[in-house]
Amino acid sequence: MEAIKKKMQMLKLDKENALDRAEQAEAEQKQAEERSKQLEDELAAMQKKLKGTEDELDKYSEALKDAQEKLELAEKKAADAEAEVASLNRRIQLVEEELDRAQERLATALQKLEEAEKAADESERGMKVIENRALKDEEKMELQEIQLKEAKHIAEEADRKYEEVARKLVIIEGDLERTEERAELAESKCSELEEELKNVTNNLKSLEAQAEKYSQKEDKYEEEIKILTDKLKEAETRAEFAERSVAKLEKTIDDLEDELYAQKLKYKAISEELDHALNDMTSI
């Protein structure tokens, strides 16, 4: 009887233990269900977050593509600007060479002009000498005319001195003829010198016109150089702006790459956490 009671107590104890284990199993099952539901909620949230991350990744990919296109466009603009600068440099060099040649021609023209001015001065001095000689000849002619008048007066007053006066008159007339010939020669020489002076003056005017033409051409070259210089400055500004744009785009790309790398790490961490959750669910 004692053995039966003892066995009953043991059975009762086993029953209580079984009930405790059943309650504990139910509690664990309930906890497992709650944990499973929590994991399912977390999984749904992670899937939603993962979808948002994928959308954001697509957006970043599109932004990266746009940035790359802008970078290529900026590189093309910078290359075009550099090519334009090189072309302008070549044009400026050609203009400078042409300007040097024009300055050389202008210097030659100025030298010829100076020589022509010297020749004109010499011609003017020669004309003054001729004028002085002609003036002296005229004075001499006037003196001879006075002498001729005196001789005629003496011939009228004294017939006895007729022969002597006639002889003197012949001499004076001969001198007068020679003087007239010299005067005519001086006048002819003066005409020649006037013609030469006229030619020198025309040459001088031609050289002055040519010098004025060179001066206008030089002003034109200076204006072209100024225009090319302004274009060069504009091209340099465009090139600098393109370089700044490229630097800005490179920084934007670097930032996007850093953010993309961070999102990849975040995605990897979420994937690992999701794998752990799935493993926990599988083990339960």
Swiss-Prot record:
Organism for this UniProt entry: Bos taurus
Free-text comment about domains: The molecule is in a coiled coil structure that is formed by 2 polypeptide chains. The sequence exhibits a prominent seven-residues periodicity.
Protein name from the UniProt record: Tropomyosin alpha-3 chain
Entry GO MF terms: actin filament binding
Entry-annotated residues carrying Phosphoserine: S61, S87, S206, S215, S271, S283
Keyword Cytoplasm appears in the UniProt entry: yes
Top-rank taxon: Eukaryota
Record's keyword terms, sorted: Acetylation, Actin-binding, Coiled coil, Cytoplasm, Cytoskeleton, Muscle protein, Phosphoprotein
Phosphothreonine sites (modified residues): T53, T108, T252, T282
Purpose of the protein: Binds to actin filaments in muscle and non-muscle cells. Plays a central role, in association with the troponin complex, in the calcium dependent regulation of vertebrate striated muscle contraction. Smooth muscle contraction is regulated by interaction with caldesmon. In non-muscle cells is implicated in stabilizing cytoskeleton actin filaments.
Record's GO cellular component terms: actin filament; cytoplasm
Residue ranges of the region described as Disordered: 1-43
Residues recorded as bearing N-acetylmethionine in the entry: M1
Coiled coil region boundaries: 1-284
Residue(s) carrying Phosphotyrosine: Y261
InterPro entries: Tropomyosin
Bias (Basic and acidic residues) ranges: 12-40
Gene name for this UniProt entry: TPM3
Subunit comment: Homodimer. Heterodimer of an alpha (TPM1, TPM3 or TPM4) and a beta (TPM2) chain. Interacts with TMOD1. Interacts with TNNT1.
Family to which the UniProt record says this protein belongs: Belongs to the tropomyosin family.
